[in-house]
């Protein structure tokens, strides 16, 4: 088991050795708390975009379903007639220059897997740059936009924001509620009290402190041909190889089991780079992966490789709340 996997297991399931990391946790807390206090005090250079900006992020390490929710937010805003763009750090991306506008024809090595997925799925203008303020400026110089979504960046305080949405895995919660490296938190748990909304991925109902949303499998897509098949393409009990290089691979494997398939799980590191050899398994079975992994595997995919597309399904209460926020932020663009 890789060190990162061991840490995740310890953070969410407990391990006595984590006590040894508490001095480092105290140092980390001081650094991140001081960073936020300087932001609140207006110290340092902070870029204020001329259009509303919404941050969609985490306070935990590991997958929370952020990319599917961003896709939902983009498509929802587009349905309302809003011109929306996205900025992202572009984790793992190696573009020729920064900032870089992602094209649907880019490869994942250039654009990053998540930004490429977002552009290919909904055609939204998207700029990557670790300096998100610079990414926003470049995006606005290229496109007349009403609204910008920041893919992650909750802790990127040099970029002012109008709304903060934080995602939490409902099953794992905040783990041991400790900050890095003794726990999975990027910021102390109290930070949740200052965000605008918390969304719990996998929650059945809304909670007093947040909204529920879940990921709904929608269709199987063949990596080579692009052919779309209903989920019934695989009969109940079908054995298949399951590949997931995401923050929480087990969630993907569990989803396949809820569809009554029998996945042989192959978990990879988040943002893993693949090759045909790395994905050659025995026995020979159909292979199903996440959409995020698929953008990196199309060039060498076999005929029986598929990805499972999933759609975020936020609660009606969140949709109503979000529409109210959009009305507040963009009163001239959205008439009541």
From Swiss-Prot:
Gene Ontology CC entries for this record: plasma membrane
Keyword Lipid metabolism: yes
Binding, ATP: 60-67
EC top class, as a word: transferase
Family matches, as InterPro entries: LpxK (IPR003758), P-loop_NTPase (IPR027417)
Catalytic activity entry: a lipid A disaccharide + ATP = a lipid IVA + ADP + H(+)
A Gene Ontology BP annotation from the UniProt entry: lipopolysaccharide core region biosynthetic process
Keywords: ATP-binding, Kinase, Lipid A biosynthesis, Lipid biosynthesis, Lipid metabolism, Nucleotide-binding, Transferase
Entry's Gene Ontology molecular function annotations: ATP binding; tetraacyldisaccharide 4'-kinase activity
Pathway field: Glycolipid biosynthesis; lipid IV(A) biosynthesis; lipid IV(A) from (3R)-3-hydroxytetradecanoyl-[acyl-carrier-protein] and UDP-N-acetyl-alpha-D-glucosamine: step 6/6
EC number: 2.7.1.130
Database matches in Pfam families: LpxK
Family assignment from sequence similarity: Belongs to the LpxK family.
NCBIfam families xrefs: lpxK
Function: Transfers the gamma-phosphate of ATP to the 4'-position of a tetraacyldisaccharide 1-phosphate intermediate (termed DS-1-P) to form tetraacyldisaccharide 1,4'-bis-phosphate (lipid IVA).
Protein name: Tetraacyldisaccharide 4'-kinase
């Amino acid at each position: 088991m890789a060190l990162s996997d061991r840490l995740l297991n310890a953070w969410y399931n407990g391990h006595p050795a984590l006590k040894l990391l508490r001095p480092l946790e105290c140092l980390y807390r001081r650094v991140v708390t001081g960073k936020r206090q300087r932001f609140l005090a207006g110290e340092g250079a902070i870029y204020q975009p001329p259009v509303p900006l919404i941050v969609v992020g985490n306070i935990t390490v590991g997958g929370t379903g952020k990319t599917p929710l961003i896709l939902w937010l983009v498509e929802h805003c587009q349905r309302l007639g809003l011109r929306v763009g996205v900025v992202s750090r572009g984790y793992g991306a190696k573009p020729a220059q920064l900032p870089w506008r992602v094209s649907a024809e880019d490869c994942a090595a250039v654009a990053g897997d998540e930004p490429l997925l977002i552009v290919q799925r909904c055609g939204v203008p998207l700029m990557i740059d670790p300096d998100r303020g610079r990414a926003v400026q470049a995006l606005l110089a290229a496109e007349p936009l009403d609204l910008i979504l920041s893919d992650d960046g909750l802790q990127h305080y040099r970029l002012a924001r109008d709304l903060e949405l934080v995602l939490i895995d409902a099953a794992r919660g905040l783990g041991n509620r400790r900050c890095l490296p003794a726990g999975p938190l990027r910021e102390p748990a109290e930070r949740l009290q200052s965000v605008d909304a918390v969304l719990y991925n996998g929650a059945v109902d809304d909670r007093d402190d947040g909204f529920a949303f879940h990921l709904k499998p929608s269709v199987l897509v063949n990596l080579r041909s692009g052919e779309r098949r209903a989920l019934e393409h695989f009969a109940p009990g079908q054995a298949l190889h399951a590949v997931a290089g995401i923050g929480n691979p087990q969630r993907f494997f569990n989803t396949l089991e809820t569809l009554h398939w029998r996945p042989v799980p192959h978990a990879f590191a988040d943002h893993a780079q693949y090759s045909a050899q790395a994905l050659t398994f025995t026995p020979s079975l159909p292979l199903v992966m996440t959409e995020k992994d698929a953008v990196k595997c199309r060039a060498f995919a076999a005929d029986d490789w598929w990805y499972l597309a999933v759609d975020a399904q936020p609660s009606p209460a969140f949709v109503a709340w979000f529409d109210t926020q959009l009305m507040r932020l963009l009163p001239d663009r959205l008439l009541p």
